[in-house]
């Protein structure tokens, strides 16, 4: 799972296996160890009752929560992502697509086929 922070926005990008793990277990998490005991953890949690996507930051950890219903609906379609605004914070949860400019032999095999890529060049 990739995390992108820019201004007042949080974006999570998930590969196919991470989306499946979210549906199966309700949790996908990663961390970055900066050394000296400083770790940034980030996670996507599903299982909330129906309602808006939420994000919280506590004790060096970013947690984005989405309802199971919304996660299942998104995962089962061609929709790229779930997008919401929570106060001043924009939250995006997206499927991670293959890069259009990276050589095919260097693609991430678990990424989703890019919708802008001709079907004969999709892996």
Positions of PLM-derived features:
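Compositionally biased, non-globular sequence tracts
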Residues: 1-4, 9, 13-123
